[in-house]
Curated annotation (Swiss-Prot):
One of its GO terms (molecular function) is mRNA binding. GO terms for cellular component: cytoplasm. The modification N-acetylmethionine is found at residue 1. It is found in: Cytoplasm. Coiled coil: none annotated. Present with 1550 molecules/cell in log phase SD medium. The modification Phosphothreonine is found at residue 235. Pfam families: PSP1 (PF04468). The modification Phosphoserine is found at residues 31, 34, 84. It comes from Saccharomyces cerevisiae (strain ATCC 204508 / S288c). This is Uncharacterized protein YLR177W. Residues 472-565 form the PSP1 C-terminal domain.
Amino acid sequence: MELPSINSTTSISDNQELRNYYDKLLFKNNSGKSLADLPGKMADFNDNSAAAHPRSRVDFINGYIGFREDKQSLLGQKNTKRASFSAFADEGRKQSEMSINGKSPNLSLFSFEFNGTPTQDRKPYKQDYLNVMNTSPNNILSPLNNSSQKYYPQKQQQQQQQQQQQQQQSIFDPGRRSSYISDALIHGNAATQQPQYSQPVYINNNPSLQVPYTAPSEYTQQQQYSSPFNARRNTQPVLNLHPAAAPTNDAGLAVVDGKNLTSSKELHDLYLDCGSNYFASDKVYKFIDSIKGTLRGDNVSASSSRIIEFLDFLKNCNLNYNPQSDAFISTAVSNASSTGAAKSKNSTSMHLHYKPLVLVSLKNGKLELLSKPQTATLILKRGDLVIIDGDRGKDLVLVVEPVVDINLALFINFLKKKIHFDSLITNSQQHFPNDQFIKTLVDTTNGKPVAHELNPKLYDIIELTQLIIPSKQVLRFATPWESSTNLHNKFQDELKALHIAQLKLRSLNNNNSGGGLNIKILNAEFQFDRKKLTFYYICQERNDFRDLIKELFKFYKTRIWLCAIPNNLSIDSKFYDSNKFEWEMYQDMMSHYSMDNTGIVVAPELNRLKLDDFQIGVYMELVKVLFG
């Protein structure tokens, strides 16, 4: 056979001879039979076999077919009517209506037989709906459309096995099952049996109601889902319709103006209950309020006038904090001014370089001036317990004055420096008389002649009069646990340390033939982080503490610091010898320990403490002897 001539523009479908050549010659099997008309031959074979052996058969698209179905209904109609997708999409809603009303509603779904005739007595086959939706019979997303299947890799094999079983069971149309089997019962049970690891579907294409497919859900293992499937894959952000409540602050702090922190009422009450006795708050508040009233000119007395005059002197010595002070006015004009109280109110109208400090109290009422960070968001109140910078560590203190003005800062700074220099003098005969100290200091600074000069080796005039901004800062509020439990444990350790130090001192003095140490240990104080242990003592002569420090370091393995109390104020006789509250408290603890079999030594509660307030007593006595 000669093939017709073709070129690049020739189409096989347009050339009849070329098409016949491919149909009759090329499409043949090994036996030489043509393969071009296989569909037609198969139809003829089925017609002959059906006529010879009429029996039921299975169609994998339309379900079970009986022998009464004619062949024309199967193959004669090429445009077979099928149920629409929207009809199957409403199946869940129709079934819910029927379950609620107790009867079937007006059906809008029709099943079509092979001849295209709709019938209402046959329910739409659920497997058709699942095939269209590409899901399993129990609402499990198949691996083809489930983008989140990677989150449940352990259950994929189980889901595939369930799908295969459902497909095998779905070969027979449930609409033609035996009458004694309830289709509603079968399908209802299959629909309600959700697997434990099923993936949720969306409702009405609303992406904000449930978790999207691309995010794993922790609660999908416990919830059941029977809502219609959303064919649209959701990748939009999830809108939380029920946001969680704002977490409560376990530290008991309250937010002010959205950025500042302050102690709540409950936390502040806890501060007052735990810190009042330990930090001698009553005596400290009384002393500071008295000084503030004197500096304002509220008190009219000789001592108050001397305090105000000395305050003006301190201002003149700190021009960097007070550029518009009276130092810019001539001495004659300054002396011709009004009374001291009025001059104190009007002399400092502006302090350009001064930033308010914070006045705090340590154990037994020892005062400290601190600075606040420039970016601090803490709103402090009197009585708050805060964590501050300590000596190479952290410490816990009581807030006395949240905002200290320049007048109070200058006066408190002078008192602290005076106490420091006095504590370094071991021989009481070397102290300069306190009743003459202020006048001598002022005259020496102004260049006037004095009867007795201050010893520059014992007193540094510049350091006495100059206010230096402290480097230690307020860090944060103390937590409830730090204010109660940790502070109580700290006090209990301090009682034991006081007892051990006195035992060590007694042992060293007994073994020393030269007389030993002539000191009296008044108190012990741990830094809050236990990195430093300070012992406060008083003595009348110079002593060598190296052996005592070695013994204490062997026991505590921390830095040991011995701090002297000025011996020219009779602090031990006025605030310690007649009371010794802490020493008696420790003796009482040990007596209960000897009678108790539990082996636990517990100090009294913080709100029941009564301590030796000798630290604030030092400030009170110093003001009295200097300006009284």
